[in-house]
């Protein structure tokens, strides 16, 4: 499972909408949708923040299964 799938699972497990998640990370509205649809991925520094927020290791967030 790659970033887009794992990110969506983590976001939904917290009961967060895409818009709310954009706000949590200070992103432009629609950014989470772009990630979850696989059009792009966040920069490495932001991936670290996302992993910390969701309480997972970076490896678990970005690695393909």
Residue locations for each model-derived region?
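DNA major-groove recognition helix of helix-turn-helix
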Residues: 35-36, 54
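Phosphate-coordinating loops and pocket residues in cytosolic domains that bind phosphorylated ligands
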Residues: 34, 63-64
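Short alpha-helical DNA-recognition segment
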Residues: 15-34
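A short, Lys/Arg-rich alpha-helix, primarily the initiator
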Residues: 1-15
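The alpha-helix within a helix-turn-helix
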Residues: 11, 22, 51
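Helix-turn-helix DNA-binding elements, focusing on the entry/boundary residues of the two helices
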Residues: 7, 18, 29, 44-47
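DNA major-groove recognition helix of helix-turn-helix/homeodomain DNA-binding modules
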Residues: 26, 45-60
């Amino acid at each position: 499972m790659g970033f887009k799938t794992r990110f969506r699972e983590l976001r939904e497990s917290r009961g967060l909408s895409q818009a709310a998640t954009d706000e949590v990370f200070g992103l432009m509205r629609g950014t989470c949708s772009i990630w979850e649809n696989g059009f792009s991925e966040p920069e490495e520094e932001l991936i670290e923040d996302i992993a910390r927020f969701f309480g997972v290791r970076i490896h678990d967030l970005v690695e393909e299964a």
